[in-house]
């Protein structure tokens, strides 16, 4: 019994440790969004719905069948035969079928089969937004982890200052003012740790939701990141028309509008039909029939107004969508160039912090720490050196955060997934 309990406890600990140690890369998060987010299923079902509806595009009008009396007198006595005089009236069975114009069927079929193409591009456009939202949360999580590393180091440094100051104060070698500043700073560090840890939990919840999973599933992330170089990229109409799904959906919508125009034009073509009537006479009358060919003439002036108005309306709708495309491309191009300029600036600032500012301040702190340990420097000077270093380290991480946000915005604009 004890052995079984030990095995179960060991198994539970292994499962718990494996669930807590799950580390996801950004690519894995993106793949989960593409496969599991509810919006994907919504669009897939909508696309399937349109494709199923398109299967009925070549349907004919239903046949019409009727039965009733034909040329029958109200006087029932006249229905019957009187000697050599046959009765009057008959029962008529009637059937009618209109044959659709082949060109109209072709136009309807092309239009209905193209309807889902717009939704497919809208699905990709929505996925682009979701994926870049995930990138933003992912990079913000990386930044928070970097800040926690800085805070952990700050906690260690401040605890060293406090303990050392307490010893020196007891020996009459230290002033108490800087000691309290260090104590307060340690409290601030712990407060910031709590806030950043809460922010990380929030990012985890948001990413779980985007991946279509239980929001409370525990996982960690791979903190590898790359600042991309877009200096050689030309943000012109060719790039956006090639990449952006919302512009592709507008192209599909223009094509759909043109196909709808074709259906309206095809509706102006004549339709032919046939009508057959069979009469079964009363009182010895012979059976008779009528067969007629029929034609509908929708191109007549008084019956074609609606179709012609729709054709003209669709033409102007096409112009409106084309203008919308040009407006969007112009906006995207301006935004992308502006964001790239900001990103280049942030990269230069980050390089300055990495190569000059932070190394110099770290060396300054180490020098102050060495002097403090050798009793040649005061605690407040060591504290000031640490405070300056800490401020610049956090500024550096904030710069990195801004650079990653700009990168995500550019990738959202050019739809780089």
Segments the model singles out, each with a brief description of its role:
Residues 188-213, 360-416:
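Short segments within alpha-helical structural elements
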Residues 129-243, 339-346, 389:
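Periplasmic alpha-helical coiled-coil/stalk elements that build and connect Gram-negative outer-membrane
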Residues 41-45, 58, 99-127, 177, ...:
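Sec/SRP-type N-terminal targeting helices
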Residues 1-27, 32-34, 410, 414-417:
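Bacterial Sec-dependent N-terminal signal peptides
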Residues 18-48, 201, 216, 226, ...:
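Sec-dependent signal peptide cleavage junction
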Residues 31-100, 239-312, 334, 412:
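A small-residue-enriched
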């Amino acid at each position: 019994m004890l052995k079984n309990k030990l095995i179960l406890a060991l198994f539970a600990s292994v499962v718990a440790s494996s669930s807590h140690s799950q580390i996801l890369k950004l690519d894995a998060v993106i793949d989960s969004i593409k496969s599991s987010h509810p919006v994907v299923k919504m669009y897939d079902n909508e696309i399937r719905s349109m494709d199923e509806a398109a299967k009925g595009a070549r349907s004919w009008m239903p046949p019409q069948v009727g039965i009733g009396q034909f040329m029958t007198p109200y006087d029932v006595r006249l229905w019957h035969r009187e000697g050599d005089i046959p009765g009057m009236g008959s029962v008529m069975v009637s059937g009618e079928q209109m044959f659709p114009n082949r060109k109209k069927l072709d136009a309807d079929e092309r239009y209905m089969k193209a309807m889902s193409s717009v939704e497919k591009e809208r699905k990709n456009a929505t996925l682009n937004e979701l994926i870049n939202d995930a990138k933003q949360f992912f990079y913000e999580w990386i930044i928070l982890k970097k800040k926690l590393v800085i805070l952990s180091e700050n906690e260690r440094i401040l605890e060293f200052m406090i303990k050392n100051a307490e010893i020196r104060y007891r020996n009459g070698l230290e002033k108490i003012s800087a000691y309290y500043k260090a104590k307060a700073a340690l409290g601030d560090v712990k407060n910031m740790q709590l806030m950043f840890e809460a922010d990380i939990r929030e990012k985890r919840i948001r990413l779980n939701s985007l991946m279509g999973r239980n929001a409370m599933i525990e996982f960690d992330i791979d903190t590898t990141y790359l600042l991309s170089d877009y200096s050689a990229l030309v943000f012109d109409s060719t790039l956006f028309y090639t990449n952006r799904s919302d512009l592709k959906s507008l192209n599909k919508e223009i094509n759909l509008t043109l196909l709808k125009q074709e259906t309206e034009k095809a509706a102006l073509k004549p339709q032919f039909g046939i009508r057959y009537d069979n009469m079964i006479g009363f009182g010895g009358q012979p059976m008779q029939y009528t067969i007629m060919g029929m034609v509908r003439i929708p191109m007549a002036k008084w019956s074609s107004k609606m179709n012609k108005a729709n054709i003209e309306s669709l033409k102007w709708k096409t112009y409106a969508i084309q203008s919308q495309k040009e407006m969007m491309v112009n906006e995207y191009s301006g935004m992308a160039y502006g964001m790239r300029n900001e990103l280049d600036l942030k990269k230069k600032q980050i390089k300055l912090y990495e190569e000059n500012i932070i190394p110099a301040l770290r060396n300054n702190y180490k020098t102050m720490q060495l002097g403090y340990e050798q009793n040649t420097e005061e605690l407040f000077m060591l504290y000031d050196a640490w405070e300056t270093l800490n401020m610049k380290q956090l500024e550096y991480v904030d710069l990195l955060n801004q650079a990653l946000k700009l990168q995500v915005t550019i990738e959202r604009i050019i739809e780089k997934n």
